[in-house]
Amino acid sequence: KFDAPLPSDFRPKIRDRYREAFATRLRAIPGVHDTITSLQAMLAVASGSSPEGLVQKLHQTGLSEYFGQHVYSSHQVERGKPAPDLFLFTAESLGVRPGACTVIEDSAKGIKAAVSANMRAIGFTGGGHCGPGHADSLLAEGANAVVKHMRDLRNVV
């Protein structure tokens, strides 16, 4: 039935399955470690995830070491993406002017936020959630370039 109410335990079960899947299946995007090492730049993470979720994801993928304390969540600002608040907060925290920042983003909302913050925006379509037309949606929001593989970031950053 399509009009049947959901069981009361539906949301908790979905949340638990989501957490279990992340805990057992989350892996770093191929090539990300080599790419980060080769960039020779000040790096930060600015994500819509919760602070706790960010720490868990970075630790599980082995990426924590690259960012140190420079991990920022939309929970730290008034408005999340597509507003520029998170990226502006990150730049300010790093002591860098927005125009000197480059954002690597896999979402159209994130590209829009980067453009609104007057930052260079590079779209990334190598994630499992990126299907046909995703690159076009990133370009439509103002991405300066779009790459599918992490190794290609070196050519556009």
Predicted regions and their residues:
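Asp-based, Mg2+/Mn2+-dependent phosphohydrolase catalytic module
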Residues: 9, 33-37, 41, 50-157
